[in-house]
Amino acid sequence: MDKNKIEQKKPGLNQKGVEEDSPLRLTADLEGNYLLDERTSEMKWLGIFYSPAGGSVHRVAKMLKKKIGADKVDMFCVNDIQAGKLLDYKNLILVCSSLGRSTWEREQRDRWAKFFPGMRKISLKDRFVALVGLGDHVTYPKNFVDGMGYMAELVTGLGGTLVGKTSTDGYVYEDSTAVIDDLFVG
């Protein structure tokens, strides 16, 4: 992924690397706790989209929904919907695993891989998108959370605005396409 292709707004960052002016503020600590501020918890019309079903990604999507408020969030597994469903929401959270572009393009078993062609046909202009990537730095140290990096490239290419960055401090890995300016894109 060409790191210059991802265009992100550069609002002020606080000491944790979180955007101050972002409408959606989501960060994670090293234990996997997802932290939301009060502005985020007051939002409505937020869609969480995840894959694969079951396992850690699904668990994290459910944790986010509960933390934000089940009455304020709709949650979908991409296995069960068409990409146009993203257009029903101004604010999106996309939750994925560590796998990267080469795996998604090679193995069509991955539901995100089947979802992406439909996504490429829509515009995410005026949409705010937070990315959550679950990574395994032991098994994938050379492409840690690359799936999130690929999603960032796709979302910005479709006109979406990425929100919510996480500091790389404390993470152990060799390389990741999800890092820009020493911050994870989600």
Per-segment meaning from a language model:
Residues 80-82:
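Short acidic active-site motifs
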Residues 16-33, 38:
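Short, low-complexity intrinsically disordered segments enriched in A/P/G/S/L with frequent Arg
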